[in-house]
A protein has these predicted regions:
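Short glycine/serine- and acidic-residue-enriched loop/turn motifs that recur at repeat junctions
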Residues: 55-75, 105-125, 155-175, 205-226, ...
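Sec-dependent bacterial lipoprotein signal peptides
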Residues: 1-7
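Bacterial signal peptide processing site
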Residues: 8-12
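Short coil/turn segments at the loop-to-beta-strand junctions that recur within blades
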Residues: 82-85, 121, 132-135, 171, ...
Length: 357
């Protein structure tokens, strides 16, 4: 049976007594649910189960669990309604997902327009993103959301500080606007105040705040309002901007690189410096997936072992110790094999079992 494990979780752990945990523990009720995908957010976690329903647990002050209430849940609760999902993304205080019919829905905190329904209101039930676009996947950040359509076009909506929507404008948007440049994207990741994406030709572009180098173009300007190519010739298969001020990605050669704020070791190169250009993660591991949180990073290696690095607040690294931080990748305790790991603001969740399709 697949086990959903939580690291460094409290209310967001989905474990009945909700303690902080420094090593993986099974999420209560997950034994009755087989999850195919999961996403850790600010203080909540969501996943798609084998019945194609979305389930969430954790903090719920803004309705981010989508069950029609604002009551926190210590175990997974089904998102209200009959929608069937192929993917979900937990942001800081809200959640978005794509249904099996490629429609995007969001719920939770929406004062920045990040729910995409044309309002700036919180919603405790899923609301459809306006515009009629067919999305392949969406990604929820601090207060803005981005998605890639079935025709490989990128759209963003919500808070627009420092050009984080990538549309060449400064106003926040409560409905999707096209990312400038006409690029075709495979994937887009919404971060704290920046966004990055991988094109269909395996090139990484970033935009938004570049105050600590998270855009990766070698500068640290206040804001980048249109997609800017990251200064590297390497080809990438995926990128993640997380809920912090740094970015990580995995190349087509299965190597992890990070850039931006590294004050807590989240870059993984053995130093605690800012990095304005991509830096190789130390250790020589071959990675399939990487995920960035608020101040920590985790990744799944090609042998399905999980590693984390950065700040260990609340045990987010899953090492089984209370060490304050790690500047290099450390193995997640317990010897499990993982198919997916998702880093939230200060907690991490992972799915153990066979690789995801």
């Amino acid at each position: 049976m697949l086990v959903l494990a939580a690291l460094g979780c409290r209310e967001d752990a989905g474990e009945p007594t909700a303690p902080e945990t420094t090593a993986p523990l099974a999420v209560a009720a997950a034994q009755a649910l087989t999850f195919s995908k999961l996403s850790a957010g600010g203080g909540h976690t969501c996943g798609v189960a084998s019945d194609l329903r979305a389930y969430c647990w954790g903090l719920n002050f803004n309705g981010q669990l989508g069950d029609g209430t604002t009551t926190q849940r210590l175990t997974p609760v089904a998102v209200a309604g009959t929608l069937e999902f192929r993917q979900v993304s937990a942001g800081l205080n809200y959640t978005c997902g794509v249904t099996t019919t490629n429609r995007a829905y969001c719920w939770g905190q929406g004062e920045a327009g990040n729910l995409g329904d044309g309002t700036k209101m919180d919603q405790s039930l899923p609301v459809q993103v306006a515009g009629g676009h067919l999305f392949r996947r969406v990604d929820a950040g601090d207060a803005h959301t981005c998605g890639v359509t079935t025709s490989d076009e990128a759209y963003c909506w919500g808070f627009n500080d420092r050009g984080v929507l990538g549309a060449g404008i400064i106003q926040r948007q409560s409905t999707p606007v096209a990312v400038s440049g006409g690029l075709k994207f495979r994937q887009v990741a919404a971060g704290g105040t920046h966004t990055c994406g991988v094109t269909t030709s395996d090139v990484v572009y970033c935009w938004g705040s570049d105050s600590v180098g998270q855009v990766g173009d070698g500068s640290n300007t206040a804001g980048v309002f249109v997609p800017t190519r990251v200064a590297t010739s390497r080809r990438f298969q995926l990128v993640d901007a997380g809920l912090g001020a740094f970015t990580c990605g995995v190349t087509t050669a299965d190597k992890a690189f990070c850039w931006g704020s590294g004050r807590n070791g989240e870059i993984g190169d053995g130093r605690d410096f800012l990095r304005f250009l991509p830096r190789a993660v130390t250790g020589g591991h071959a990675f399939d997936r990487v995920t960035t949180g608020g101040t920590h990073t985790c990744a799944v290696a090609t042998d399905n072992r999980a590693y984390c690095w950065g700040l260990n607040a609340g045990g987010a690294l899953g090492t089984g110790t209370s060490v304050a931080r790690s500047l290099i990748p450390v193995a997640v305790a317990g010897g499990r094999f993982f198919s997916q790991v998702s880093a939230g603001k200060s907690h991490t969740c992972a799915r153990s079992g066979a690789a995801l399709s």
